[in-house]
Amino acid sequence: MKIKFLGTSAGWPLPRLGCSDQICTSLDPKDKRTRSQALINERLLLDVGPDTYRHLNATDINPTTIEYAAITHEHPDHTYGLWDLGHIYNSKQIKVVIHPSTFQKIQKLFFHKEYNVLKTLTATPITAGDLKVSLLPVNHTNSSFGILVQEEDKRLFWAPDFKSFPDETTKALAGIDLIAMDASDLRITSSGHQTIEEGVKLGSQLKAKKVYFIHIGHRTLPHKELEKYVREHGGTQFEIPYDSLEVIL
């Protein structure tokens, strides 16, 4: 499974407008982050935020190969790129994998003739070429999910926004090959997001083989320091991805 991290930031890109903290003034290109999004096997998009056009206009991406897009929840940083996704020349009609409760909230964003909307209930896999895609509930909004992608015996879970997992999700993810999870804050707790400190504990609890922190906010650390932090506190299986990173699972 080929995973390309197109974007890795939280709801607002880094650097934040008008901000002069150590992340937002960093000269390290890895600290320049756009909204979290990934491309799997060049055919499946995970989330469709407002940076989608920018991501798909990269020179090493052929947008006409994209056939599917899966949505975690209704917030703008995960859905506002639908306008651009429906206007890719010479492409097949995009199939959007979405939970009915999420679709109900954002259906006015869709132009139904431009998409094939595949509404799916949790834990009901949809076949996307050589991939199986299913949604597992997470605690964020009342219609938020993580995206489980499986290719043969390899499993990826994409969960950019959550405070915690319901028990059934935790059980389903035991021993996951790679989990990409919320890193909005380092230690500052909020009602809708886990901290990186909590994520290190969760990754260890799941016995995940690889943990990549995404949805990175500016109340964390610069890339190099954050990479050092998660490895010292969690181990070598913990990673801080950056925009454009490719991983083979």
Can you say where each PLM-predicted feature lies in the sequence?
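Cap/insert and terminal regions of metallo-dependent hydrolase folds
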Residues: 164-248
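Short, glycine/charged-enriched secondary-structure capping and boundary segments
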Residues: 18-20, 59-62, 83-87, 110-112, ...
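Divalent metal-coordination and catalytic microenvironments
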Residues: 3, 47, 56, 73, ...
